[in-house]
Amino acid sequence: TPIPRELILPLTKHGSTRSKPLVKPGDKVLKYQAIACSEATGIVDQHAPTSGVIRAIENFAIPSPLNKESMCILLESDGFDAEIDHNAIADYRSLSYLELANLIEEGAIFGLSGEGYINHLKLSSGKAVKLLIINAAESEPYITAGEALLREKAKLVVLGAKILQAACMAERCVIAIDSNKTDAIEALEQTQLNCPIELIKVAPKYPTGSEKQLIQTITSKEVPSGKYPADIGILMHNV
């Protein structure tokens, strides 16, 4: 898929919280470069999705329940998709759990589910984690995105699970997957050789992939009403 010539990047998140631009019109930016930040809790920094030139910071009409214009950054792509230099970590095990959480925060990683949970906030809840669940069970019928990801990127998913386990200091880590996702299961089993992460196959029955239902399926524990999984020593991340 070709990169669009122009990208309109809204600065408003969650309805009203606006990020502060870190760039100005005329600036050249690289892919993954931070272009806006917010001091509000629960709002991650924004990064350039490709390389190019900032052409404007002004109001644009965007899809919104309020049906009104919003302040946005207009990025004109240069077509090169050039990235910033990454300071790669040779071995994540050389870092403390706080350093790992900080790197996740700098990477502006957050969940793509409806809640959009910020990953580093989940990791820094201050509550002891006994079990980390990597949720590879599809939450709705006919969804296959997780299965495709695991077929193609099983090694990276397992590595990510190891990093998350180190970051939250979980005693145990499992990957939960629908039992009928045979290709994804095979890819994980080949990757998991000599790996302490457990693979748990669950019945492909809606809504097993939902957070609280999956926790109950795996642990026989129920998350109390008004509480979070962290309150019973469990942390869950989707693939």
Task: For every predicted segment, state its role.
Residues 1-22, 74:
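N-terminal, Lys/Arg-enriched amphipathic/low-complexity engagement segments
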Residues 81-84, 132-146, 226-227:
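Gly-rich Lys/Arg/Thr-decorated short loops/hinges at beta-loop-alpha junctions or inter-strand turns
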Residues 24-37, 55-56:
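Short, well-structured beta-strand-loop connectors
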Residues 171-239:
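Hydrophobic alpha-helical positions that pack around
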